[in-house]
């Protein structure tokens, strides 16, 4: 039997054909529901995470006023627009584990707006009374956050464009859209919507608040005061490994489940969301779908710290050292005994001692679970995805652990090796001489500095938007990272790593 094209009309047939291997939405969609959430940045992670939580609320708990309107701000978002619109905004989540695969058709995304087509439509949608939450997955670079000063990059050309009152109806950045929509709600006497960051950053809500309030103060101090007093920006820890979808994934879905999907999502069974209960205009009962909703922002920060330092820090170790050694997938790296031991020892000996205890959380078990997740061969998680946008990741995932280890005189050799591997990676040439693309918003600047610096870290450490003054002046750190850089340049990753494994 030929695969069925995914759309509303074919859902019943898809369910019948898939039997116990596929789940489909049976709730109402379209004009029968209200779109209470506008989500900016509809990629794989959003569709495997927040959209799945909302789908469960709509399917199992009758929530019909928090369907999602997706928004794409960038020209490349046209591909997602076309894929979703061609199948009534439905898509398939494929969960893969050692036990097999399970398909789940998700219907919580009810519509999609492509800003380059109609920027006014996006502003109007955010400003609409039915909109209670504007959620974000815009990656670290989308926040225009200076890691060194912790301030808005107000001098950035796109921010400067959006700060010009003449451009209020044609913004470029997320903050330009948020500002325009909130200004309109303020004029209409509505409450501000909650701005909910779902990006993988520590204190993501606090950073979002500070960036938006800073932007608003430069435009209209009165509106900035209203946002500060009445707005809400929950902090959240998000977790679900979601690799890029490949043509092989689409083919397998068609052949094994019988679904023809333009852009399915492949992910793992594990999913976690720890969310601060701070909302300005209502929220759905996320906890009924499995989210951990907490009252104290400190609780979120503790979970965030565990996840960013252990999971994402280890991902960085796997990604940059793995790419330099010619590996292609995360599980391949973890199958190599040397890398496997390196990751485990870095977590246990250098990162874990720096982390706070969380009641009910066994850090050793968490680390073991991470090793199992990294080793899952069925999701085929590509190293280029892990390496993407490192300038927004390394300062969060690796450097804070190094700084804290120095402060408490703890070990940090392996963490320095990871930073050195990234510095070497920035050259765009692996240890066999093969070139690869360094996909980073700061690529030109960082690549030039990496090549100019060679085995001297000073050129890169002088990028003040990424690295603070303390590390640049610490002799222990400079000695460790220089030693690692020299060894990697001379001997390559594979011959250097044994020096960092007990």
Curated annotation (Swiss-Prot):
Alphabetized UniProt keyword annotations: NAD, Oxidoreductase
Record field: catalytic activity: D-mannitol + NAD(+) = D-fructose + NADH + H(+)
Pfam name, any one: Mannitol_dh
Superkingdom of this protein's organism: Eukaryota
GO MF, one annotated term: mannitol 2-dehydrogenase activity
Classification via InterPro entries: 6-PGluconate_DH-like_C_sf, 6PGD_dom2, Mannitol_DH, Mannitol_DH/Oxidoreductase, Mannitol_DH_C, Mannitol_DH_N, NAD(P)-bd_dom_sf
Record bears the keyword Glycosyltransferase: no
Positions with a binding annotation for NAD(+): 37-48
EC number annotated for this UniProt entry: 1.1.1.67
Keyword Cell cycle: no
Subunit structure, interactors included: Monomer.
Family the entry assigns: Belongs to the mannitol dehydrogenase family.
Function: Catalyzes the NAD(H)-dependent interconversion of D-fructose and D-mannitol in the mannitol metabolic pathway.
Protein name: Mannitol 2-dehydrogenase
Organism: Aspergillus terreus (strain NIH 2624 / FGSC A1156)
Lineage start: Eukaryota, Fungi, Dikarya, Ascomycota, Pezizomycotina
